[in-house]
Every structure is written in C-alpha cells, then in structure tokens.
Amino acid sequence: MIGFKSFFMRTIIFQVLAILLLWGLLVAWVKYWYYPDMEKYFDNQQRIVAAGIANILDETGTDNIDYRGIIKTIEGMYIDSINNGMQDEIDYHPLFVVYDRDNRVLYSSQTQGEPLRLPPSVLSGSVNYAGANWHLAGSWKEKRQYRVIVGESFNDRTTLFGNPADVPLLGILAAIIVTLLFTAYFSLRPLRQIARTISDRQPGNLSPINVSEQYQEIRPVVMEVNKLMARIDAANQREKRFMADAAHELRTPIAAVLAQLHLLTQVTEQQERREIIGDMQQGLDRAASLSRQLINLAKLEAEDFPLKIEAVDIYAEIGKCIAQHVPYALEKDVELSLDGSEDVVVSTDRRALIAIFTNLLDNALKYAPPGSRIEANIRSLAPLGCYITLRDNGPGVSEEHRSRLFERFYRVPGTQQTGSGLGLAIARNLADKIGAQLRVTEGLDDRGIGFIIDLPESYRPQTESEPRP
C-alpha cells in the first residue's frame, strides 16, 4: 500500500524539527555559556567592591576613623549604582562583611541576628545565611590585614539578569509553530494554483504553460511539464501524419487493384487475365512494401525506439552489405567497390547502421544505368568517429531538389523507377536515432550524387535542444 505523502506535512515537520533543534541550542547556550558568564561578571563586580574596601582599610586602619561609616557609604553607593542600572526600582540588599586578621567580624550589613561566620581561607562561594542563599566574592589586599566579603542573594541576582522560568518558552515555541503552519500553507499556494491551471485545461489542450508567470522555484517543474506535453503533442502529430500518409499512399494501389479486379471479372481471354493478375500482384506488392515502410517509419519516430549499442567493425560490416548486393550489381552491369580505413571500430547500433547504408545502396543501384560505378569509402576520424561515403556517377539529382530528398514520400520529378519516397526518410531517421548525421555530397566524375554518414566514435543520442543539421 502506498503511504500517505504530503509536501505540506513534510515541510512542516522539517521546519519544526529545525526550530526545535535551534531552540535546544539556544537553551543549552543560555544554560551552559550565557548564565555562567553572567555569574562570573557579577562575582567580579562584588570582588572589585570588596577589593576597594580592603584597600581603604589597609591604608587608613580602623583605630582613628569611622571605618563603619566609610563602609556604609560605599555600600549605599553600590546599592544606588545597581538600582540606577535597572529600569524598575528593586529592593536590593547586598551583604557586606569585614573580618580582621584574626577572623573577627568588624562590620556586617546584616544587623539582625548572628553575623556571617566564614573560615579564614574562604573568599568566594555560595552559602545559606539568614534564610537565603548567597553568592559570595571577597578580597584580601597586600597587607592581608582585612578580609572583605560582598554577598548577593540568589533572588537579587536572578532579578538582575532575569529568571528563565519567567520566560514563557513553551508559549513562544507554540506561537512559532503556529506561524510556521500559516506561512507553509500560504507558501504552497503557488503549487495549488499551478495544479488548478493544469486540471482546468481541456483534454486536447497541449499548449505550453506560461513559465514567466510562475515563481522561480516552480519554473523547473512547469518547464518539464511543458516538455512532456510537447512530446505528447509530437506523438499525436506523428500518429495523425502516419494515418494521413497511410490513407493517402495506400489509396492509389488499392484503388488500382480494385479496378483491375473488376476488370478481371469481365475478361475471358486467358492471356489478358494473366496480365491483369500480374498487374494486381505488382500493385499488392507495392501496397505491402509501402505498409512495411510506413510501419518502420512510425517505429523510428517513436521515442522508445530500441537500440543495441555495441562495438562495430565498420569496414567488415559495410563490406558484407556490398557483397550481398554484388549479384544485383552484376545483373545491371554496375561496378561496386569499397576502400578506405580498415581498422575503424565505433560503438553504435549495427542493424541501424546497416539499414542506413542498405537504403542508400539500394537507391544507388536502382537509378544506376549500365556501365556506371558506385564507390563506398570509409575514412577514419579517430578519436571523433568516421565518415562512410557512398557516391555514384549515375543520373544524379539537381541542386534544386537535393534539399527535399529526405522528406517523406518525396520523389524527384521525372523519375521513371517505382518507389514510395520513404527510403531516404527512413535512413535519415535511423541516423538521428544513433546520433549520426546523414547529408548529401557530390557524386563521381562531376556526375551522380553522393551521401555521407557522419558516425560518431560512440553513441550519443540527439537531445531536444540540438537542431537537426
């Protein structure tokens, strides 16, 4: 069973996963980098204030001055600086404790209850005192006469740089996901629009969709749809052309056979009947041959025409083809010859290549008068492939008609020999299928006509963007 697939859901899932990943990275950064750095920053502030007080006490002593008033003033200034840095006034109460060298408490801002007692070696850390948790940071100076500790309650510090629990993280995440749903839905609207454009078309409408009106991201899909419709339209046109050609070309021989059959019913003389039957046989043979050629041409024009690509010894295969036509050439008193490179091997479809050359050779023999010559030549173009040239010194074709030789059913005016006019069209289509080029050249002795099969070293199918030469 085919599973449910939704591009919308796929987009949402990937976006939500990306947001969750980024969200997790943000939380990890806040927890493991941002907050520890802020803790160090505030601890360092406390340590600087403690160092300042310790330095003053080292210089002035505690005997002759009101050191408690000095510490109280510094404490007030510190509280004011914190409050001034906040947008909203807070009830900020730090803890200031001063110890002498004997660890006696000389000053404590906590006037209620027992003052904070710490071991002599402690300058920083966290303690629970007076019902609250405190961050402690302190300092000795060079004389080590006085140890000053400045404490900040956990609650005050949380107020200073915010409590993560106060931020509605889940609410923000939910809002982001809902926003993603809306943006993904509206972002996919162009896909739904192009789907409607295609579904609203009439079945026979294969005209291309306007690509310039589409969004950049959808254009490749629309272009491929246009190419598909173009291929379907071309296939339809080929089918219509085949039906029209078949009906047109078969009408004449079939009509002739029907007329001869009607005449046969009225003739009683045996010799005349045999002549009519012979004419009927020729007409039926021509119709059968024409049908085969039409079918072959239709197969060639199909996109799925099968090819069997293999290494082909060109000289050997062309030699075999010429050898098969020698009896017919001898019968017509026509000289056949083959020369050129004997070591040419290319990768192509052997049957298609032989069919091309056979069509050309059949035409040359058909129109060659007695005593004429037909020469085949193979020229290596390694590593680019080879030329297979077939030339004769027969009647030839005038320049004005050469450009139409590869058209279907085209026959040079004034031609006496019978034929359907499909042979060269089939050869040209076969050449296109194997990536070769078939073109006209000059004949022998300033007469006749020639054809060149330009065969590449290896098979390379012709793409839609490559024009036919």
UniProtKB/Swiss-Prot annotation:
Quick check: keyword NADP in the entry?
no
Protein EC: 2.7.13.3
Tell me which stretches of the chain form a coiled coil.
Answer: none
- The PTM Phosphohistidine maps to 248
What's the name of the protein?
Answer: Swarming motility regulation sensor protein RssA
* Reactions this protein catalyses: ATP + protein L-histidine = ADP + protein N-phospho-L-histidine
Taxonomy, top ranks, is: Bacteria, Pseudomonadati, Pseudomonadota, Gammaproteobacteria, Enterobacterales
CDD domains in the record: HATPase, HisKA
Tell me which GO cellular component terms the UniProt record holds: plasma membrane
Show the SUPFAM superfamilies listed in the entry.
Answer: ATPase domain of HSP90 chaperone/DNA topoisomerase II/histidine kinase, Homodimeric domain of signal transducing histidine kinase
- Domain (Histidine kinase): residue spans on this chain: 245-459
Q: Where in the cell is it found?
A: Cell inner membrane
Functional description taken from the UniProt entry: Member of the two-component regulatory system RssA/RssB involved in regulation of swarming motility which has been shown to be inhibited by saturated fatty acids. RssA/RssB regulates cellular fatty acid composition, hemolysin production and cell surface topography. RssA/RssB negatively regulates the activity of SlhBA. It can also act as a negative regulator for the control of the swarming initiation.
Specify the domain of life of the species encoding this protein: Bacteria
Q: How does it sit in the membrane?
A: Multi-pass membrane protein
Q: Which GO terms describe its molecular function?
A: ATP binding; phosphorelay sensor kinase activity
Q: Where are the transmembrane segments?
A: 12-32, 167-187
Query: What is the deletion mutant like?
Result: Mutation in either rssA or rssB confers a precocious-swarming phenotype on LB agar: swarming occurs at 37 degrees Celsius and is initiated at a lower cell density and more rapidly than the swarming of the parent strain at 30 degrees Celsius. Both mutants also exhibit increased hemolysin activity and altered cell surface topology.
Quote the gene name from the UniProt entry. Answer: rssA
InterPro entries the record matches: HATPase_C_sf (IPR036890), His_kinase_dom (IPR005467), HisK_dim/P_dom (IPR003661), HisK_dim/P_sf (IPR036097), Sig_transdc_His_kin-like_C (IPR004358), TCS_sensor_his_kinase (IPR050428)
Q: Which UniProt keywords apply?
A: ATP-binding, Cell inner membrane, Cell membrane, Kinase, Membrane, Nucleotide-binding, Phosphoprotein, Transferase, Transmembrane, Transmembrane helix, Two-component regulatory system
